[in-house]
Amino acid sequence: MSKIKSIYGIHAVSGVLDAAPQRIVKLYVQENRDDQRLQSLVEKAKALGVKVILLSRTELNTLSNEKHQGIVADCEEVENLDESALLSLLKKRETPALLLILDGVKDPHNLGACLRSANAFGVRAVIAPKDRAVGVTPVVRKVACGAAEMTPFIRVTNLSRTIDWLQKEGVWIVGTAVEAETLIQEIDLTGDIAIVLGSEGAGLRRLTKERCDFLAQIPLRGSVESLNVSVACGICLYEVQRQREAPAPS
């Protein structure tokens, strides 16, 4: 029997309704809340056959002590994906693969933001270690604004071994490091690529860094020496998109 997990917030619930409405067991909505976005979600849920239950704000607060925006959904948990899912994803590719590897990101807000950027820029899968890293939590789902439901999130036992396997499959591994001598825009990102970002504060682990085919830095002009991992994620993924959509030289 599938485990049930609560998610909350308009964007998170909307993402599940769009991607996998069959996962929603019950939808709890704050009664008499004047919010057109909420009403639209309720109408959509009912049209999809989802059971909607009206509760007072006090009752809803007992289901979630986070900022729920008047809506909480009991959902069947997504099946955990592991290394075996990567092979299937890569075999199905018709265009150059783009993967995102997060080496030990622990903050759920950062993971949620990275998932949102990953979905926006067409990342095929986000890969993270099972240990010493955050998984997909209700906070992650809320920050991701539905992207957690649409972007495969694969947790692996041994990140170094996974990187080795990806390289054998023809994927180039591009790590980010403040000490790198090469700028991200100087690397050809038009082929099968995995962008690797390190944890908050510590950056890439030594073993991960040693396995990268390239190390790149994001050019900074101010006094700060590094960026938040989710900000760096968006910049790197945009650069991949920029290169891939650039006109071919005449």
UniProtKB/Swiss-Prot annotation:
Disulfide bonds: none annotated. Keywords: Cytoplasm, Methyltransferase, rRNA processing, S-adenosyl-L-methionine, Transferase. It catalyses: guanosine(2251) in 23S rRNA + S-adenosyl-L-methionine = 2'-O-methylguanosine(2251) in 23S rRNA + S-adenosyl-L-homocysteine + H(+). One of its GO terms (cellular component) is cytosol. Pfam families: SpoU_methylase, SpoU_sub_bind. S-adenosyl-L-methionine binds at residues 198, 218, 227. HAMAP family: 23SrRNA_methyltr_B (MF_01887). Specifically methylates the ribose of guanosine 2251 in 23S rRNA. Belongs to the class IV-like SAM-binding methyltransferase superfamily. RNA methyltransferase TrmH family. RlmB subfamily. This is 23S rRNA (guanosine-2'-O-)-methyltransferase RlmB. It comes from Coxiella burnetii (strain RSA 493 / Nine Mile phase I). The gene is rlmB.
